[in-house]
Amino acid sequence: MPIALPHDAKAGPTKAEVRSVLLGKLDLGADDHFAEVGSCTGAVTIEAARRAGRVTALERKADRLEVTEQNLAANEDSLAAEIDLRNAEAPAGLPDDADALFLGGSRNFESVLDHAVDTAVDRIVMNVSRLEVAGRATEAFRERDILEEVVQFQVSHGYELAGATSFNSDNPVYMLVGGASGSDDGSDGDDADDGDRAEATQ
């Protein structure tokens, strides 16, 4: 069932097709504790809360957290998880017992990965849209021995043009997938998370 997103934020929601791939990689179950860095509109938060037993979502911007809360309320009848929304930075605001982790932007991503390694997060997914950040993120995953795969994909939507069908293309998304069970450490991150999130949602 599609989710309802009546409220919006500047960066916009993660696109439905991207969410589908993301959820497939995370493979959330009823016993899982899912943690999210950068909830924004709450699109991923809502999808995860339909599948996981617990959801902890961080959003450092109060106005975006309010949008997350409003969109969660619009979908409350379909949510199964216990949800904890935190107006906090990562990694400081992250739980220590997450089974799965999603990074929706690149702010402090190396420190977040260090936390994931220290707490042995089983499934980690990070989305970025800028090539340079994707390169740095790939190296950071490799340095910590947590990289399983990098997926690059692009979605196009058809529209009618002169009685035929043409396509508008969304920006490409680079999805880094890994797991930190039994891995080692690293250091600091990139501050320009909004650029990745804004482009990945277009």
Where do the model's predicted regions map?
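Class I SAM-dependent transferase core
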Residues: 1-30, 35, 40, 66-70, ...
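Short SAM/SAH-binding signature in class I
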Residues: 98-105, 123
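Conserved SAM-binding motif I beta-strand of class I
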Residues: 54-59
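A short, conserved alpha-helix within the catalytic core of class I
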Residues: 108-116
